[in-house]
Amino acid sequence: MDTSGPAAFVNGEILKMFVGRRVRTVVQAQREEGGLLIGQSTDGHQLTIKGASGAPMSHYVEIIGIAEPNQAIRAEVCTDFGENFDPAPFNGLCKLANGQMKDLFL
């Protein structure tokens, strides 16, 4: 496992605490606007993903990239998780990884 550039697990609410840092999240693709992917985070926030165009609409997509202001992420890696993804466990993981269990995560 490469730990040289760890990515924090974030949902829409937690994303704003990591501006300028590498993050990992999952969004459900909703639409594309001018080369940007607009998606819904696992906790219901609307996120703008730069550099992730081409994702199938309604699919869940894992995004690893750099958090930017205004609920945006500059994508480095995008992985299509398909339509059958339960967002609740990932959202719970984000809360644990940034709350009471954060010492267990990079």
Curated annotation (Swiss-Prot):
Keyword DNA repair: yes
InterPro entries assigned: NA-bd_OB-fold, Rfa2
Disulfides per UniProt: none
GO biological process: DNA recombination; DNA repair; DNA replication
Keyword Magnesium in record: no
Gene3D superfamilies in UniProt: Nucleic acid-binding proteins (2.40.50.140)
Keywords: DNA damage, DNA recombination, DNA repair, DNA replication, DNA-binding, Nucleus
Location of the protein in the cell: Nucleus
GO CC annotations, alphabetized: nuclear lumen
Domain of life: Eukaryota
GO MF, one example: DNA binding
Primary location recorded for the protein, binned into one broad class: nucleus
Subunit organization: Component of the heterotrimeric canonical replication protein A complex (RPA). Interacts with RPA1B, RPA2A, RPA2B and RPA2C.
UniProt record similarity statement: Belongs to the replication factor A protein 3 family.
Function: As part of the replication protein A (RPA/RP-A), a single-stranded DNA-binding heterotrimeric complex, may play an essential role in DNA replication, recombination and repair. Binds and stabilizes single-stranded DNA intermediates, preventing complementary DNA reannealing and recruiting different proteins involved in DNA metabolism.
Name recorded for this polypeptide: Replication protein A 14 kDa subunit
Record lineage: Eukaryota, Viridiplantae, Streptophyta, Embryophyta, Tracheophyta
